[in-house]
Amino acid sequence: MAKQTAHEYFTAPSGPKSINNEDDAQESVSHCLPALRKDLSRYDGFLVACYSQHPLVPLLKREAAIQTSRKPVTGIFEASISTSLQVIHPDEKFGIVSTGKVWDRILTHATTAFLGTGEGASKRFAGVETTGLNATDLHDAPAEEVRRRMKEAVKRLLKKGKVGAICLGCAGMAGMEEMVREACVEELGEEEGTRIRVVDGVMAGVAWLEGAVRTGF
């Protein structure tokens, strides 16, 4: 019988309340990595749940406890892009809906780097649209304001070409899939709007890690 997967969660004992730029991401490493090191041998895989090209991902991969046991490590950013590329058709693109305006530049650069510089790779990426909210606003701001901004960002993204998948570009957007779906249906109609894949990076990352652990990749 297959073993059941147990998920445990880690939050740094200190550090930025919200990752709103690259400096925050870098600062969070200094709080997370020392606290994580003592537990690296206890777990089979690791998911960094910050939607960015977070420096903790490559740093964890370099840790001896990770390398010697070939434990898989990924981030929700990387997992969402990989999943999107697998679920869309060859003539479709994927895009990202994120929080503050600064993430437009950061995630565009990070996605280009992740995909590589080939012309074909860039054709698969529709771009980034942002809500103007930060991660904490997604749950602290009035619900109707969050819904309005999310749906506006989704509709702008859908105007950028034949989009087949939309990545939720912040861990704080978990559970907002239906909000994104509503915007897709409003913009494209029931049939086309229902066809769009909405990719939650946390779910994509967990699915990839489970497969990697079971297969030994």
Tell me what each language-model feature is.
Residues V97-G169:
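Active-site rim beta-loop-alpha module in soluble metabolic enzymes
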Residues K3-P16:
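A short beta-strand-loop structural module common to alpha/beta enzyme folds
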Residues L60-I88, A183-V206:
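Short, acidic/small-residue loops that bind anionic groups at enzyme active sites
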Residues N21-S41, E145-A153:
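Glycine-rich, highly charged phosphate/nucleotide-binding loops
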Residues V202-F217:
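Glycine-rich phosphate-binding/hydrolytic loop that grips phosphoryl groups
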Residues K155-L157, K162-G189, R195-I196:
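A C-terminal functional module that forms or caps the active site or interfaces directly
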Residues S14-N21, N134-H139:
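A short acidic, helix-capping loop that chelates divalent metal ions and anchors anionic groups
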